[in-house]
């Protein structure tokens, strides 16, 4: 039997062994094959990374912005050249199908492209005359060492909306990727190095609690970007803020989709199937609840269940597979527990994800509950799995009121051709990202990404202009030039 490879941290431009003696298996969730082992690193590892990044910041922050942008452009080119390999790594680590993995790679590349626009993004502004012979100018500067804590569900896209922008703007970076999906990160490092990145600018430390707390507490780390669950995200925001760091924390979701009587049902059902069961439901933009008007509810449910029954489940590397596994055995058990809870609390199970799935990996099939109510656990909790709840409503107003009862407010979608309904939805729904006649309202990199309420803690969102503000600080220079006598 071949020896399982143990991964190393990437610090100061080198792959270095962690100080830990604790390693965890990285498993292909579709086959249960052990791919490698990842170190559960120590505070000592974070200390080394933070000091390295702080030292590198002294020179990297002074590098001309166009030169930094050229390195990001080189990185974008290399990512594009290796997109199939990157997608393959995502599929074997995360489980999503090849098409979805390629889509994620594309979104990651898009974020790098946006970051490569740093010369424009870093520009300040000025006013030639604020008083007699006095002018003022506003300059942007990098903030320092930044820490990023990324989840397993988008191992390329999420880190790529963190470190490329931060680095392009002159910061140095320490990434803690998910210990469940480290191989993709290893490839990103390899390509970024080839793009010309100097030592110490980008560092990777694998791990769990000690690494997270090290990032939250180290005085050299000035800002933290987090994506993950609500309990951890709330802790990250509180602890980071307590230590006087700038923090953005993108957390849980329970996204509602509203279907009105005038919706094109074929198109609507196709979009909802993709939104609810794509990436095995393990995404913060997944459709978790559908509220459908009573007039079309029966027809909608018939089409929805039929479409769900046609979904091909299996290894994401196999042709035609749409739904891959959830990430680990614990996630599967948790999901099965929610299915049982839904039955016990009175929801009607119309598509049972426990049936017709193999035990070879951590598979759960498309699961649909009808006649769900807002007092049920499956409506309240973020399940993060291919489980969809359906509620029948009288009208749009009731649907919006139901959605607004959720503690989460990441995204919401509406299917209709009625412009008045669209306006009402836009003005009254509590959510940060809205979709009209589409299933997943994730915006492009140049728009901010994140929600409201318990889906986000902080003031500046990821991506868009918010990300530029998050990773920079401003310096205002007011200058007086006494009028010369040129006579």
From Swiss-Prot:
Pathway in which the depicted protein is active: Polyol metabolism; myo-inositol degradation into acetyl-CoA; acetyl-CoA from myo-inositol: step 7/7
Catalytic activity from the UniProt record: 3-oxopropanoate + NAD(+) + CoA + H2O = hydrogencarbonate + acetyl-CoA + NADH + H(+); 2-methyl-3-oxopropanoate + NAD(+) + CoA + H2O = propanoyl-CoA + hydrogencarbonate + NADH + H(+)
Name of a matching Pfam family: Aldedh
GO molecular function, one term: methylmalonate-semialdehyde dehydrogenase (acylating, NAD) activity
Keywords in alphabetical order: NAD, Oxidoreductase
Assembly with partners or alone: Homotetramer.
Organism: Bacillus licheniformis (strain ATCC 14580 / DSM 13 / JCM 2505 / CCUG 7422 / NBRC 12200 / NCIMB 9375 / NCTC 10341 / NRRL NRS-1264 / Gibson 46)
Gene Ontology annotations of biological process type: inositol catabolic process; thymine catabolic process; valine catabolic process
Annotated InterPro entries: Ald_DH/histidinol_DH, Ald_DH_C, Ald_DH_CS_CYS, Ald_DH_N, Aldehyde_DH_dom, MeMal-semiAld_DH, MSDH_GmP_bac
Active site per UniProt: 284
Residues that bind NAD(+): 150, 152, 176, 179-180, 229, 251, 382
Encoding gene, per UniProt annotation: iolA2
Domain of life: Bacteria
Family the UniProt entry places it in: Belongs to the aldehyde dehydrogenase family. IolA subfamily.
Protein EC: 1.2.1.27
The protein's name in its UniProt record: Malonate-semialdehyde dehydrogenase 2
Job of this protein: Catalyzes the oxidation of malonate semialdehyde (MSA) and methylmalonate semialdehyde (MMSA) into acetyl-CoA and propanoyl-CoA, respectively. Is involved in a myo-inositol catabolic pathway. Bicarbonate, and not CO2, is the end-product of the enzymatic reaction.
């Amino acid at each position: 039997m071949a020896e399982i490879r143990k991964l190393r941290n990437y610090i100061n431009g080198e792959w270095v062994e962690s100080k830990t003696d604790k390693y965890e298996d990285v498993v292909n969730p579709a086959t249960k094959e052990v791919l490698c082992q990842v170190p559960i690193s120590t505070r000592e590892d974070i200390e080394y990374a933070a000091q390295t990044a702080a030292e590198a910041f002294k020179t990297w922050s002074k590098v001309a912005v166009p030169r930094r942008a050229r390195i990001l452009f080189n990185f974008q080119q290399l990512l594009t050249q290796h997109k199939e390999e990157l997608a393959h790594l995502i599929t074997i680590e995360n489980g999503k199908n090849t098409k979805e993995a390629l889509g994620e790679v594309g979104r990651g590349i898009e974020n790098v492209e946006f970051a490569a626009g740093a010369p424009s993004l870093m520009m300040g502004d000025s006013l030639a005359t604020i008083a007699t012979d006095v002018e003022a100018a506003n300059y942007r500067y990098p903030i320092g060492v930044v820490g990023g804590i990324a989840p397993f569900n988008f191992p390329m896209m999420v880190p790529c909306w963190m470190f490329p922008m931060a680095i392009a703007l002159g910061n140095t970076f320490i990434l803690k990727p998910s210990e469940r999906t480290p191989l993709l990160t290893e490839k990103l490092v390899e390509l970024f190095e080839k793009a010309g990145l100097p030592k110490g600018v980008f560092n990777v430390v694998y791990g769990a609690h000690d690494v997270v707390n090290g990032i939250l507490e180290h005085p050299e780390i000035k800002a933290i970007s987090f994506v993950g669950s609500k309990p951890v995200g709330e802790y990250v925001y509180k602890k980071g803020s307590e230590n006087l760091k700038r923090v953005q924390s993108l957390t849980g979701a329970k996204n509602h989709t509203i279907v009105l009587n005038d919706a094109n049902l074929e198109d609507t059902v196709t979009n909802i199937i993709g939104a609810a069961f794509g990436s095995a439901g393990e995404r913060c933009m997944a459709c978790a609840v559908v509220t459908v008007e009573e007039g079309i509810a029966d027809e909608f449910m018939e089409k929805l269940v039929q479409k769900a029954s046609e979904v091909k489940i299996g290894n994401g590397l196999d042709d035609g597979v749409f739904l891959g596994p959830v990430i680990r055995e614990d996630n599967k058990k948790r999901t099965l527990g929610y299915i049982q809870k839904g039955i016990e609390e009175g929801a009607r199970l119309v598509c049972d994800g426990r049936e017709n799935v193999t035990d070879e990996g951590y598979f759960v099939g498309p699961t649909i509950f009808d006649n769900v109510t807002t007092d049920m656990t499956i409506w309240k909790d973020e399940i993060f799995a291919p489980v969809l709840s359906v509620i029948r409503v009288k009208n749009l107003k009731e649907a919006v009121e139901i959605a607004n009862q959720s503690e989460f407010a990441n995204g919401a979608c509406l299917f209709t051709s009625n412009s008045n309904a669209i306006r009402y939805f836009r003005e009254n729904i509590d959510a940060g990202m809205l979709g009209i006649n589409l299933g997943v309202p994730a915006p492009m990199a140049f728009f901010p990404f994140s929600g409201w309420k318990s889906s986000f803690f902080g003031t500046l969102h990821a991506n868009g202009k918010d990300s530029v503000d998050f990773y920079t600080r401003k310096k205002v220079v007011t200058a007086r030039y006494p009028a010369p006598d040129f006579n």
